[in-house]
Amino acid sequence: MRKLLLLALFTAVPAAAQTPAVEAARAAGIIGERYDGYLGVASAVSGAVRSQVATINIQRRSLYSNLAARKGVSPQDVGITAGCQLLARVAVGQAYMWADGAWRRRAAGQAAPVPDYCR
């Protein structure tokens, strides 16, 4: 079921348009991926970037809800499944939120942060 959700999730919609400000904040570790499939704010950020993060999360929530309705699962399940894939893509220096709610940064030489439940 997880593989079907992932396939549907990542083929159903093109990658969300990321603005240069969002990409710069992500690269700086100011914003990052959360375990639940949403983008989060790890430290102080401008109102414009915070607004763009909220817009991205609204788009993700809509996608997760639509996919969940089609697959007969909860939007939270779809988000967690997406979170597994998004965390696997976190680059060195980028921030990410683990399931315990703590923000971390991926260090050089560190494996991609993938929770055990994703495997």
How would you label these PLM feature ranges?
Residues 27-28, 36, 65, 69:
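Short, surface-exposed polybasic-aromatic patches that bind anionic ligands, especially phosphate groups
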Residues 12-14:
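N-terminal signal peptide c-region/cleavage motif recognized by signal peptidases
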Residues 1-7:
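Sec-dependent signal peptide recognition
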Residues 52, 64-82:
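Surface-exposed patches in mature extracellular/periplasmic domains of secreted proteins
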Residues 8-9, 66:
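A periodicity- and composition-biased signal for non-globular, repetitive helical segments
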Residues 18-33, 40-44, 48-51, 79-119:
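Amphipathic, charged alpha-helical segments and their helix-to-coil junctions
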